[in-house]
Amino acid sequence: MEVASAVAEPDACSLDHYLSLPDHSMDERIAAARARLGASTVLLGHHYQRDEVVRFADFTGDSYKLSKIAAETEAKYVVFCGVHFMAESADVLGRSEQHVILPDLNAGCSMADMAEISQVEACWETLLGAGLGAEQVMPLTYMNSTAAIKAFCGERGGLVCTSSNARKAFEWAFARAEKILFLPDQHLGRNTAFAMGIGLDEMVVFDPWQIGGGVPAEKLRAAKVILWKGHCSVHQRFLPEHVDRVRAKYEGIRVVVHPECRWEVCQKADALGSTERIIAEVEEAPEGTMFAIGTEIHLVNRLAKRFAPLGKKIITLDDTGCLCTTMYRISPQHLAWALENLLEGRVVNQIKVTDEVKHWARVALDRMLEIRG
């Protein structure tokens, strides 16, 4: 009777082999591989990446900053420690001979997944069927969307935005059309429009899972902003009572949140802005300032550690901690695997957008980069 069988050791170049190794054994290997690759490779790290990964990045930033770097870099290989839509955008903006690598292909984005191209196309037909002319509505998508959604917007005269330039994108769109269809984050769209003086009663939420988006045709025709029913799973967890709680507990605390948070949370905050803006808020504050920050926990913890010696105390707005699990998927093992394969001449996990989609997605992204000012 067979009571045991041999288990084959994973190939030394396989991802399974790397995943079987401890974190601490990756540091020297990543550093050595990075050094050997030199200027041929650039490592981009989003602010929400775990510390063990982001410390190896050549550049860190929000999605806007990293998209600009991706468009400008001369490196042949772009290793993007972020999520899938970011790597897609880097491929769209990069040169044809560049290779964009996402260390873990499972690093996706739940918000981006909330707007499928077939749903957006059906929404557009619903708007036209409600009596709106194509020239009346400007499709505008948040960076946190697939390349196909970006291409959809680009082909119809629209553009992409990030949380750091959303207002400029809205102004650009309203200079050319009466209405905006904003994809896929309802909260960023609502907060941006409201800050521009557009009332909540001038916005509607289009639910792709309901017939006609769940909005009567007359309300679609009356709305200035049509918001897609999508959200960030991390930022939606922050609630108005979290703001009330920290204010009651810490006198004089400054509450700063990301505009992907609910409108009710943003209205109670002292300031809201992109991750780059949040960092600047902390940098510019005087010694002794205390912050409660409503964004992903890795960035909050990193800021707390960085500014503690400068007399600034930073806590998360929700003390249960809000982790972006898809960002967290990229581990030191994934990064080491991708880099060491490059040393052997193997490009793994390359993100490649089709030429047709790339053309119109680039149009939309270029419009975003041009309006930054």
Curated annotation (Swiss-Prot):
CC terms in the record's Gene Ontology section: cytosol
GO BP field: 'de novo' NAD biosynthetic process from L-aspartate
Keyword 4Fe-4S set for record: yes
Binding site for [4Fe-4S] cluster: 109, 232, 324
Main location: cytoplasm
Pathway connected to this protein: Cofactor biosynthesis; NAD(+) biosynthesis; quinolinate from iminoaspartate: step 1/1
EC number: 2.5.1.72
Catalyses which reaction(s): iminosuccinate + dihydroxyacetone phosphate = quinolinate + phosphate + 2 H2O + H(+)
InterPro entries: NadA, NadA_sf, Quinolinate_synth_A_type3
Name the UniProt record assigns to this protein: Quinolinate synthase
Organism of provenance: Acidobacterium capsulatum (strain ATCC 51196 / DSM 11244 / BCRC 80197 / JCM 7670 / NBRC 15755 / NCIMB 13165 / 161)
